[in-house]
From Swiss-Prot:
Keywords: ATP-binding, Cytoplasm, Kinase, Nucleotide-binding, Transferase. GO terms for molecular function: ATP binding; CMP kinase activity; dCMP kinase activity. Belongs to the cytidylate kinase family. Type 1 subfamily. InterPro entries: Cytidylate_kin (IPR003136), Cytidylate_kinase_dom (IPR011994), P-loop_NTPase (IPR027417). The keyword Protease does not apply. ATP binds at G12, P13, S14, G15, A16, G17, K18, G19, T20. The gene is cmk. This is Cytidylate kinase. GO terms for cellular component: cytoplasm. The lineage of its organism: Bacteria, Pseudomonadati, Pseudomonadota, Gammaproteobacteria, Lysobacterales. It is found in: Cytoplasm. It catalyses: CMP + ATP = CDP + ADP; dCMP + ATP = dCDP + ADP.
Length: 227
């Protein structure tokens, strides 16, 4: 039987703040949380561990089916991710893993293989789904849809600050180029290109604090229908 629990989709490009906002909103609502990007990154980590060639789609599709991904949700504190039983949380957030995940996500067979795995997260009392095609492909019937965005410069600045605070030395211009390249890949791929759902509420997070965005999203849910 299809689960009809309510779903809030939060889509947007890398660095728009959707991951942090989604986790906090899910925790405050008491809903489940899906980080769809973590699934693709997990496959990327598994492919890296297996030393697979990113230009070999067949091998990556097999890797997708063979990879076991488990989420340990820590609420607002974040998400612990196990790949085939091993903790891969820190590796998932590396820039190299993100680039690999973006390339893998462009393979139609990989997206198809992960589609039902993502939909299985939908259960009572509700789900906050964070990604790039949550409102357009995975949960097109979601009652609540949000698309977060921000300028490439703003997003590169946020990522630069995060990495510097972690002691990781990185050049801002390099990050900006990577973000712009990823935006182009995500927008131009044939299957599930990055775009807002027609019924999504667009929020430009440039210059906004996380709490401001969270309150805006929670307010949208309260305005549209009782939870």
């Amino acid at each position: 039987m299809t689960d009809l629990s309510p779903v809030l989709t939060i889509d947007g490009p890398s660095g728009a703040g959707k991951g942090t906002v989604s986790r906090i909103v899910a925790a405050r609502l008491g809903w489940h949380y899906l980080d769809s990007g973590a699934l693709y990154r997990a496959v990327g980590v598994a492919a890296s561990w297996a030393d697979l060639d990113v230009s070999d789609p067949a091998a990556l599709v097999r890797c997708t089916f063979d990879t076991r991904v488990e989420f340990d949700d820590a609420g607002e504190a974040g998400l612990r991710v196990l790949v085939n039983g091993a903790d891969a949380t820190s590796e998932l957030r590396l820039e190299t893993t993100g680039a690999l995940a973006s390339a893998i996500a462009a393979i139609p067979e990989v997206r198809s293989a992960l589609k039902e795995r993502q939909r299985a997260f939908r259960r009572a009392p509700g789900l906050v789904a964070d990604g790039r095609d949550m409102g357009t492909v995975i949960f097109p019937d979601a009652a609540y849809k949000v698309f977060l965005t921000a300028s490439a410069e703003e997003r590169a600045g946020r990522r630069h600050k995060q990495l510097m605070e972690k002691g990781v030395s990185v050049i801002f211009d390099d990050l900006l180029r990577e973000i712009m390249a990823r935006d182009a890949r995500d927008a131009q791929r044939v299957v599930a290109p990055l775009r807002p759902a027609e019924d999504a509420v667009l929020i430009d997070t440039s210059g906004m604090g996380i709490e401001d965005v969270v309150q805006r999203v929670v307010g949208l849910l309260a305005d549209r229908a009782p939870l």
